[in-house]
Swiss-Prot record:
Name under which the protein is recorded: Nicotinate-nucleotide--dimethylbenzimidazole phosphoribosyltransferase
Gene: cobT
Tagged with keyword Protein biosynthesis: no
Origin superkingdom: Bacteria
A GO biological process held by the record: cobalamin biosynthetic process
Top-rank EC class of the record's enzyme: transferase
GO molecular function, one term: nicotinate-nucleotide-dimethylbenzimidazole phosphoribosyltransferase activity
């Protein structure tokens, strides 16, 4: 998958011509499911997940090369005093991922998932969205193109996650711009903002959306003005996966905000995606509902870093294993329905 040129027009062209699911593979999966040694529907969402895998991969459900991709970026809006942690923590956590010391490392080992971490110019934070656009169109498009390379090594299930001090503020601004309501509807504690700091966070989101209000009718403009490098890269990765018919699991509040940009640009853009979990960040459930999705897990987590999507990958792998490994009634000599 490659994209020539940097303007948003390249991505608008891709978004207008998205591949759809494979109807024949879906029918074949449903037919096999009907023969397995269980009552119809007894595996609940596991059956739906197996059908989803078949429809998007075009083959019997299987997960052989799952990958977690984490995109890390820094944000100029942290200068507004909206988070208790300094931006240096983003780089420190990238190093922790590399050393195997983060929660995501343990989950990847547990579920046998690959892990890639993408450092997105951490020494050069985006513009402060309360004062200027986060990125130029050229930089935003280039970062989307970079994110598309997440699938270059090959994967058949992509888990999307992020790391970035200040990025729940970014996610709140994107959701506020896309869906309205009030800034307070979308702002939560993130890494621990409370009291006056939480109020500064609300004020920053209000100020940012007001500043850019004349340019918020275009989802890609929302992304470049209010987003960040990890937002753009995640959007690029999700889009690249769609073009290559790779199923995607989306992680938490920030990853869902990146996905929402694509959904706003094309209502079918997330048909190949499932939401891995609903986080404890207050705006996440509402943003998932706006996407018309139902999360696979609800564990009260709010870490980000791809952790919820990675845990959900274990469920997806189980769904594929049940579909492919269970015996049929005929094979097992079990009587079917009268």
């Amino acid at each position: 998958m490659s994209v020539s040129g940097l303007p948003f027009d390249d991505f608008r062209t891709l978004l207008r011509d998205l591949p759809g699911p494979d109807a024949r593979a879906l029918v074949a999966a449903r037919e096999r499911d009907a023969q397995l040694t269980k009552p119809p529907g007894a595996l609940g969402r596991l059956e739906e997940i197996a059908f989803w895998l078949a429809a998007w991969t075009g083959r019997p459900p299987a997960v052989n090369r799952p990958l977690v991709a984490i995109f890390a970026g820094n944000h100029g809006v942290t200068r507004q005093g909206i988070t208790p942690f300094p931006p240096a923590v983003t780089q420190q956590m990238v190093e922790n991922f590399a050393a195997g010391g983060a929660a995501i490392n343990q989950i990847c080992v547990t579920h046998d998932l690959g892990l890639k971490v993408f450092d997105l110019a951490l020494d050069y934070p985006t513009g402060d969205i309360t004062e200027e656009a986060a990125l130029s169109e050229r930089d935003c498009a280039a970062t989307m193109a970079f994110g598309m390379e997440a699938i270059a090594g090959g994967t058949d299930l992509l888990c999307i996650g992020e790391m970035g001090i200040g990025n729940t503020t970014i996610a709140a601004a994107i959701n506020y711009a896309l869906y309205g309501g009030s800034a307070r509807d979308w702002v939560g504690p993130g890494t621990g903002s409370e009291g006056d700091m939480l109020e500064r966070k609300v004020a920053a989101v209000e100020k940012a959306v007001a500043l850019h209000s004349d340019h918020l009718d275009d989802p890609l403009e929302i992304m470049r003005r209010l987003g960040g490098r990890e937002i753009a890269a995640m959007a690029g990765a999700i889009l690249a996966a769609r073009m290559e018919r790779i199923p995607v699991l989306i992680d938490g509040y920030v990853a869902t905000a990146a996905a929402a940009i694509l959904k706003a640009a094309n209502p079918s853009a997330l048909d190949h995606c499932l939401i891995g979990h609903v986080s404890a960040e207050p705006g996440h459930l509402r943003s998932i509902e706006m996407l018309g999705k139902t999360p696979l897990l609800a564990l009260g987590m709010r870490l980000g870093e791809g952790t919820g999507a990675a845990l959900a990958a274990g469920i997806v792998k189980a769904a594929a294993a049940c579909h492919s490994g269970m015996a049929t009634f005929a094979q097992a000599g079990v009587s079917g329905k009268h």
